[in-house]
Amino acid sequence: MNPAHKPANQQRRSPARPPTVLYHLWHIGLMLFVLAVRLAYQRQLSPEVAKYSLVLIVGMAFATVGDVVNSAISGIEPISRKLSAAVILFGIAYGLYAIVLYKFAAPRLRSYGGFAYRARWLIVAVVAAANTATWVLHIRNSVQGHHFLEVGSFLFNLIIYTALISFSIWYFWADRFSLLALSVLIGGLLIPVSDLYLFFTWLPSGQDSNVPGFDLYALNWILYFGGQVLFAFLPVAQDSDSRPQRT
C-alpha cells in the first residue's frame, strides 16, 4: 500500500515515541532524584525546619509509591482499581503536605493579625466551595459506578485539596508574597490541577480501560512533576525566614 493512502490513525502512530517502560522509569527516577536532593539538603536546614521537612519527604515518598501504582508498568488494572489505590497513597502524601503548611503558616498569620488573619477561614470556605463545584462539574460523571472512587474522590477533593490549596495561600500571605513562597503556592495549585486532569481524562464518561493513553500520562506528568518540584521549596522558604538576618 502506498504510504500516502494509509488510514489516518496509522499515520498518526508512525512517529517514534519513547518505550512505555523507559518513560515510566524516567518518571519514577526523577521523583527519586528529587527525594535524594531533599534528603541531602536536610543538613542545611535549621533543626526545627528539618523536622518538618522530613515529614514532607515522607509525604513525597508516599506520592512516589503512588506514581508507581498509577504507572502503566504496575500491572494494576483496570484504571478504576489503579486510581482507588492511588487515592489512599496520595491522600497520605498530600495530607502530610497540608499539615506542615498549616504548622508553618498559622503561627505567622496569628502574629501579624489584621485582615489576613481574620480572613483565613473565609479563604478555606471559598476554596472548599470551588473544589466542590469542580468535582460536581468535572469529576462526578467520570467516577459514577465506582463507589469507592466516587466517595473517595469527593472527600479527597473537599478535605485534602481544600487544605493544600488554602494553606498554600496562607503561606504565601504569611511570607509576605516572597518569590520562594510563590513557588510553594504554584506547586500547591498545580498538584490538585494535575489530579483534576487525571480523573477527568483517565475515566472519560465512565470508561474503564486497562491503561491510559501515553499522551494522557505525559500531559498529567508535566503538571504533577512541576508542582512537586516547586512545592519542594517550602522548607527552604521557611528556613530562610527563621534564621537571623546577617548584618
Annotate each language-model stretch with its function.
Residues M1-T247:
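Polytopic alpha-helical membrane-helix bundles and their juxtamembrane interface segments
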